[in-house]
């Protein structure tokens, strides 16, 4: 018998109240992969399912409308908001990803939530500037890089905001190339000023589902640049999102706002 399903709707990484990337946190319900994919596709929204084992381990299972994902940080912020509401006196809440058993620490700082995690291995793929330009439709201004905090990203720097928002790549081609190489899409970004960046994520097949905020890309960019950063995202989809990262010894923190919708 399944535990009755409870669904929480949240918006995450919003730069202002009412803004953010939507996610559904699901407790209980049918745990089969087919049911989870069906729910994510039916709601047309990123879903994260919370599973609690008898030993107290909390596992998080991420599903996009078109595929399962090893890690999604805006959905993890949503999980943090749900779990801290349940246990408001907790200082740190530990969870584990369902696909790869990656351990994540959830923290709260005022009205914001952070995920502490570490750099992960990336596929051994040599991506040339010409290949990146063909995939994205514009020439990168620095060598493309691969980095990961649990969901490998190809990071491609573009010239400026105009170049970033002119991008209209072939999403099906990016998805096929990503599957072939074990990479979860392309993150295009540019430098606004010292320590401040703006980007767009190309991972979903449907352009209407472009992320307003991509925490795993912010983490990957932090690793690639070797510095803490402030990252804006979402203007392409009418949103206004803000992701903050901090290097924390051998780990890093990725966080921002999470609010119940």
Language-model features: locations:
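Conserved hydrophobic/aromatic beta-strand scaffold that supports enzyme active sites
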Residues: 25, 49, 114, 153-155, ...
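Hydrophobic anchor at the start of a short beta-strand
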Residues: 5-7, 47-48, 144, 186, ...
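A short glycine/serine-rich beta->alpha loop
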Residues: 12-15, 61-70, 204-211
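Conserved phosphate-donor
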Residues: 43-58, 173-207, 232-257
